[in-house]
Design a protein with these regions (language model features):
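Short amphipathic alpha-helices in soluble, non-transmembrane regions
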Residues: 8, 58, 232-236
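N-terminal flexible segment immediately upstream of the FAD-binding catalytic core
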Residues: 1-56, 72-103, 251-261
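Short, acidic (Asp/Glu-rich) active-site segment that either coordinates a divalent metal cofactor
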Residues: 74-78, 85-89, 198-206, 279-281
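FAD-binding subdomain of flavoenzyme oxidoreductases
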Residues: 94-247
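Short beta-strand-to-loop capping motifs
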Residues: 46, 221-225, 273-277
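Soluble FAD-dependent oxygen oxidases
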Residues: 37-65, 104, 147, 171, ...
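Short, conserved charged micro-motifs
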Residues: 50-53, 115, 228-231, 279-281
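Terminal amphipathic helices with adjacent charged low-complexity linkers/tails
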Residues: 249-281
Length: 281
């Protein structure tokens, strides 16, 4: 292990590579109930070349790589299966460029959803994918994150225009471009988004963004059965009503919401809805 750590520190720098027990413990788990497994070493890259250099060392020593954002996953995705390198992208947290006229933004993987939207707000823009947790853009792209807004805006795969990816041999590739449509080459964005770190590490992500709606209206509807609630959503979509968010909550979950938040919602299947629009419609 000392040889691996020494090679990593030589390829990056001493402060970027740690085997501190507390840090290893923090990178041994996420928000899931899966058993924690400590990585062999934790690396903090500052830029794409750091990741490339680290990948080359990992390949030399035949060690697996485990990209780590904020550890908000509920599926155990960041937990090592065996000794390897946990790559913490928290230091790569810059918003590289906002092209407000093209409705595009390029970010490093450690940028969080809240951080991004706070900056986009200055331009009258927002990023719509909302998985609930304040995850990083790298983690959201790696897991093809979705949320209650997917009914209108789609999932993470629908937002990604380009990825800068470091492959296992340390080579750096671009998977797309800024173009809205291209028939040139394979659809590599679709391959890498949702790959959960198995094909490479993302070091920059170009995303579509949207204008902030003039009006946002929320609503709640209660139904006698889950089947009735689902049928209502189908009818709404078939009618072409531009719903922006929808979430179905069953009786058991409503009961827990009432207990935790001291609310008095009827304990019935419930739809929580949101609509985006403006004065003109």
């Amino acid at each position: 292990m000392s040889t691996l750590v020494g090679a990593l520190r030589e390829a990056l720098s001493v402060p970027q590579v740690t085997i501190n027990e507390t840090v290893l413990e923090l990178h041994s788990k996420d928000e899931s109930y899966h058993q924690a497994v400590k990585p062999e070493v934790v690396v903090y890259p500052y830029h794409a070349q750091d990741v490339s250099n680290m990948m080359k060392v990992a390949q030399t020593f035949n060690r697996p790589i485990y990209p780590f954002g904020l550890g908000t996953s509920l599926e155990g995705l960041v937990i090592p299966r065996e000794d390897g390198i946990s790559v913490d992208f928290s230091e790569m947290n810059n918003i590289i460029e906002i092209k407000e006229k093209d409705f595009l933004v390029t970010v490093q993987p450690g940028v969080t959803r809240t951080q991004l939207n706070n900056e986009l707000k200055k331009y009258g823009l927002f990023f719509p994918v909302d998985p609930g947790a304040d995850a990083t853009m790298g983690g959201m792209a790696a897991t093809n994150a979705s949320g209650t807004t997917s009914v209108r805006y789609g999932t993470m795969r629908d937002q990604v225009r380009n990825l800068e990816v470091i492959l296992a041999d340390g080579s750096i590739i671009q998977t797309g471009s800024s173009a809205a449509k291209s028939s040139s080459g394979y659809h590599l964005n679709g391959l890498f988004v949702g790959s959960e770190g198995t094909l490479g590490c993302f070091t920059s992500i170009t995303l579509k963004v949207y204008g902030i709606p003039e009006h946002i209206v929320a609503g709640r509807a209660v139904f006698p059965t889950v089947h009735d609630a689902v049928a209502a959503v189908v009818s709404i979509l078939q009618a072409g009503i531009p719903i922006a968010r929808v979430e179905l909550v069953d009786e058991a979950s409503i009961q827990k919401v009432n207990e935790f938040s001291e609310t008095t919602y009827p304990v019935k299947p419930t739809l929580f809805l949101e609509f985006h629009g403006n004065e003109a419609g």
